[in-house]
């Protein structure tokens, strides 16, 4: 995988802060959320890797970047939500994320977390 240029957009919201990260070539994107009332946790969301780029290490780049950014922000945990039993669920588990609760709004989704400090 070649080096990929990214564009990062920051937004301060009523509930906290959001960082949107998009590859210039549109090969991947993700977002990180930090809520004002939970400074120890970063939420990884909206993860997408373009179909023709899958299996080339982009997912690892996203996780490594997210975990590094979370540490810089002083967080000790990253949380994310995935479809229970999906490929993504298994993939995150292989990368050290553990299930910790079902999603109350949609029980077909599960919350996962990883301690990063």
Model segments located where?
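Acetyl-CoA-dependent GNAT
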Residues: 1-45, 50, 69, 105
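A general lysine-centric signal
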Residues: 34, 113-114
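Conserved acetyl-CoA-binding loop-helix of GNAT-fold acetyltransferases
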Residues: 49, 55-68, 94
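Conserved GNAT acetyl-CoA-binding A-motif
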Residues: 70-83
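Conserved beta-strand-loop-alpha-helix junction that forms the acyl-donor binding cleft
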Residues: 80-89, 104-109
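Conserved acetyl-CoA-binding loop of GNAT-fold acetyltransferases
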Residues: 93-102
């Amino acid at each position: 995988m070649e080096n990929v240029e990214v564009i990062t957009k920051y937004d301060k919201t009523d509930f906290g802060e959001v960082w949107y990260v998009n590859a210039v070539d549109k090969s991947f994107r993700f977002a990180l959320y930090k809520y004002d009332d939970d400074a120890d946790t970063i939420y990884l969301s909206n993860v997408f890797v373009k179909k023709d780029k899958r299996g080339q290490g982009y997912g690892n780049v996203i996780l490594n970047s997210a975990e590094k950014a979370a540490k810089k922000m002083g967080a000790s945990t990253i949380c994310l939500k995935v479809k229970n039993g999906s490929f993504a669920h298994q993939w995150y588990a292989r990368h050290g994320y553990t299930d910790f609760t079902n999603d109350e709004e949609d029980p077909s989704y599960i919350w996962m977390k990883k301690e990063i400090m």
